[in-house]
Amino acid sequence: MAHDRIIFPMPASCEVVFDVFHYHHWRARWDSLVSHTELDGGAPCPSVGAVSASTGGGLLRALSMRTEFVSYQRPRLAAARMVGTSFPFSRWAASMKHERAAGGGSLLIYTYNIEAGPRLLRWLIEPVVHHVFRRQTVKRFARMHAFLSAHAAEVEAWQRAYHGARCGDPL
C-alpha cells in the first residue's frame, strides 16, 4: 500500500479553500483531473455518509470512482474512502486537513493511502500508480492555487450571500 502526505500552501482562508474543493460548481471551474462529480441525491456538497461518483478528466477520463465521506467538518477536515474497486485501485482513501498559515492564506494537508490491483500484479503496477497519482495530485492542487489566486474574492462574496442551509455550518 502506498501512503503519502503533501502540504500545499494556498492563497486563501481555510473556509474558501474547503468550499472551492467541496462545492462542485466551484470545483468544475478548476479541477481538470475530474470531468464530472455528483453526489447521490444531488446535494451541492458532501456530508458524512454521502457517496459521490466521479469521472476522470483529460487522459484519465476512463477512470471513475465512487467514494463515501467518513468525515466532513467544514472548514477543517474532510475524508473519504473508495466504495468498491476501480482499476487501477483496489483501495483508496484520502483526507484533506486545512490549517491557517502564518501571514495569511492556509495550508491544505492532503494525506492518502492507495493500493493497486489486481493483487497478483500489485508489485509491478503499484509503484507506477503511486507515481502517477502523486504527480496528478500535485498538478491538481497547483490548478486550485492558481484559481484561488484569481478568484478567492469571488468565492468570498458567494460565501457571504449563501446561507449554507444545505451543507454544514452557516457561513
Where are these regions (language model features)?
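Hydrophobic-ligand binding "helix-grip"
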Residues: 28-29, 58-109, 113-115, 170-171
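Anionic, Ser/Thr-rich low-complexity intrinsically disordered regions
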Residues: 5-6, 36-40, 56, 79-82, ...
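Short, solvent-exposed coil/turn segments
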Residues: 1-3, 32, 47-49, 62, ...
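Terminal "cap-and-tail" regions of soluble proteins that handle hydrophobic small molecules
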Residues: 3, 7-11, 61, 97-171
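Hydrophobic ligand-binding cavity/cleft-lining segments
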Residues: 1-44, 167-171
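Amphipathic alpha-helical interaction elements
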Residues: 19-22, 57, 129, 133
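Conserved short hydrophobic interaction patches
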Residues: 23-24, 72, 143, 147
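Short, hydrophobic/aromatic-rich segments at coil-to-beta transitions
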Residues: 45-53, 72-81, 153
